[in-house]
């Protein structure tokens, strides 16, 4: 971290306020700060515009909190990784399909079979296929329902 927690909270608060004021989507990336994240967002839940939790890799409890807040959950190529994505595969059914935001996180987190290569937008298809497989749906059902 290059800034103090106090500075980060102040910046995040300004980000939230601006998003509410302009009613523009709130795009969030949280790591190891879920409790603080929720403490800052819950009081303004009703005012928040559409909100995406980018590249979700948190716990079951954190996911439930985010789903209950009505947030979109960003799923990346991480879910295609047999080693690191296992816990996400176990959680994916907790997310309503229309609240899954399929993301590339380009240029990082390329899905298998492209691990180690530069991630590109066309690779979202691999992520959608993995979600379809886990949820027992067709690729078409996932593509029609998720906000790609």
Descriptions of predicted regions:
Residues 98-106:
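Non-cysteine beta-strand/loop elements that form the S-adenosyl-L-methionine
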Residues 77-81:
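Short histidine/acidic/glycine/proline-rich micro-motifs that form metal-
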Residues 15, 128-131:
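Aromatic/hydrophobic pocket-lining residues that form π-stacking "cages" and hydrophobic walls in ligand
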Residues 132-136:
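Amphipathic alpha-helix from the class-I
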Residues 1-69, 82-86, 90, 95, ...:
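Divalent metal-binding pocket/active-site signature
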Residues 106, 122-124, 128:
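Active-site gating loops and adjacent loop-to-helix segments of metal-dependent hydrolytic enzymes
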């Amino acid at each position: 971290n290059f800034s103090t927690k106090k500075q980060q909270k102040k910046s995040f608060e300004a980000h939230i306020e601006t998003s509410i004021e302009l009613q523009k989507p709130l795009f969030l990336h949280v790591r190891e700060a879920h409790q603080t994240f929720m403490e800052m967002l819950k009081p303004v839940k009703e005012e928040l515009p559409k909100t995406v939790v980018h590249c979700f890799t948190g716990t079951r409890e954190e996911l439930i909190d985010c789903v209950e807040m009505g947030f979109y959950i960003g799923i990346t190529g991480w879910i295609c990784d047999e080693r690191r994505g296992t816990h996400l595969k176990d959680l994916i059914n907790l997310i309503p399909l229309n609240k899954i935001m399929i993301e590339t996180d380009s240029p990082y987190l390329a899905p298998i079979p492209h691990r180690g290569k530069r991630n590109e937008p066309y690779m979202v298809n691999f992520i959608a296929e993995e979600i379809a497989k886990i949820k027992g749906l067709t690729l078409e059902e996932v593509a029609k329902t998720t906000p790609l």
